[in-house]
């Protein structure tokens, strides 16, 4: 059974305490609702994992936990089997006592692109919207964050996060809540808010930017990473039925257009920190994610286009500040 009591106790003593006016009731409602058909199987995998305390823990350069002496073949097999019950693993990688989870995405590459452009994270309270398995939450802690809170309604991601947390010694500096951004009140409590890989899935992208702004303290920093296309400040792609085989892609702006959107929503000091094409080395099929990946979504005769004929995925990082 995945519980959230530790998080409630934690925020009861800090500047997030007003969240307790709504959060426990929301989580209780989530627990009462019909869960995914495999949720019991996933939560059992977490429950059956051994409690581990790392002898060496590296969250600064990777997400790596090691024991003082190598685990037995039986212990490794148990951990490996239980973690494979939580496939597909999309965001990572993780190295846990000799079990290496080679995820679909090299999320460490994204972190390496983003980190140099951020304000110092030491001591900060952070929100990561659409955090997936929580890989970047651990990297935020490694970079010095005081508390990293992720939200993502996908139940498999919650179980993946709790599995990793259990193998990291039940670390309480990072937490994942099974909520969407629309379920959060205007907390105005986070020093840094991340939204990475979310904006193009939103029917109303400007509303999403306002929601992110409502979570920030004054002078807080927004880190926005999303799909973009080439063009000027008036260029926006509105795909048809699918983009790179994804049905729920609504708006893909150019980076200059996205900068203009952020300014329209009242953000200041907006800058385009990075733009790069997504490669099949960064997003690919692995033994931990065995279904289709980026290579299957690109035109086999022209890798600069998706199978639908749109420009192939490229992603931008924009940094902005709430006044």
UniProtKB/Swiss-Prot annotation:
- Catalytic reaction list: carboxy-S-adenosyl-L-methionine + 5-hydroxyuridine(34) in tRNA = 5-carboxymethoxyuridine(34) in tRNA + S-adenosyl-L-homocysteine + H(+)
Alphabetical GO biological process terms: tRNA wobble uridine modification
What Enzyme Commission number(s) does the record list for this chain?
Answer: 2.5.1.-
Keywords on this record? Transferase, tRNA processing
One of the record's GO molecular function terms:
transferase activity, transferring alkyl or aryl (other than methyl) groups
**InterPro entries attached here?**
CmoB, Mo5U34_MeTrfas-like, SAM-dependent_MTases_sf
Q: What class of enzyme is it?
A: transferase
Q: Which PANTHER family match?
A: METHYLTRANSFERASE (PTHR43464), TRNA U34 CARBOXYMETHYLTRANSFERASE (PTHR43464:SF95)
Q: Spell out the family assignment given in the record's similarity comment.
A: Belongs to the class I-like SAM-binding methyltransferase superfamily. CmoB family.
* Subunit details: Homotetramer.
Q: What is this protein called?
A: tRNA U34 carboxymethyltransferase
**Encoding gene, per UniProt annotation:** cmoB
């Amino acid at each position: 059974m995945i519980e959230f009591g530790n998080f409630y106790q934690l925020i009861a003593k800090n500047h997030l305490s007003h969240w307790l006016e709504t959060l426990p009731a929301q989580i209780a409602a989530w627990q009462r609702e019909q869960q995914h058909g495999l949720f019991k199987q996933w939560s059992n995998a977490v429950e059956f994992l051994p409690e581990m305390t790392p002898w060496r823990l590296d969250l600064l350069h990777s997400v790596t936990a090691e024991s003082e002496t190598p685990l037995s073949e039986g212990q490794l097999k148990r951990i490996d089997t239980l973690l494979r019950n939580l496939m597909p693993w999309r965001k990572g990688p993780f190295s846990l006592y000799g079990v290496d989870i080679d995820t679909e995405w090299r999320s460490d590459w994204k972190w390496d692109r983003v980190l140099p452009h951020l304000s110092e994270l030491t001591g900060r309270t952070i929100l990561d919207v659409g955090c997936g398995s929580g890989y970047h939450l651990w990297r935020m802690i490694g970079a010095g964050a005081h508390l990293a809170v992720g939200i993502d309604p996908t139940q498999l991601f919650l179980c993946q996060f709790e599995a990793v947390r259990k193998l990291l010694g039940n670390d309480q500096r990072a937490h994942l809540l099974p909520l969407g951004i629309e379920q959060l009140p205007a907390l105005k409590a986070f020093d840094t808010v991340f939204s990475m890989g979310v904006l193009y899935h939103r029917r109303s992208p400007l509303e999403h930017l306002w929601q992110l702004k409502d979570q920030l303290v004054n002078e807080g920093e927004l880190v926005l990473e999303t799909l973009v296309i080439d063009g000027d400040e008036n260029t926006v792609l509105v795909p048809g039925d699918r983009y790179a085989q994804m049905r729920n892609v609504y708006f893909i702006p150019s980076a200059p257009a996205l900068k203009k959107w952020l300014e329209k929503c009242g953000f200041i000091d907006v800058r385009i920190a990075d733009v790069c094409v997504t490669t099949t080395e960064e997003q690919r099929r692995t033994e931990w994610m065995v279904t289709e990946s980026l290579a299957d979504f690109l035109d086999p005769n022209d890798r600069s286009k998706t199978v639908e004929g749109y420009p192939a995925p490229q992603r931008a990082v924009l940094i902005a500040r709430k006044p």
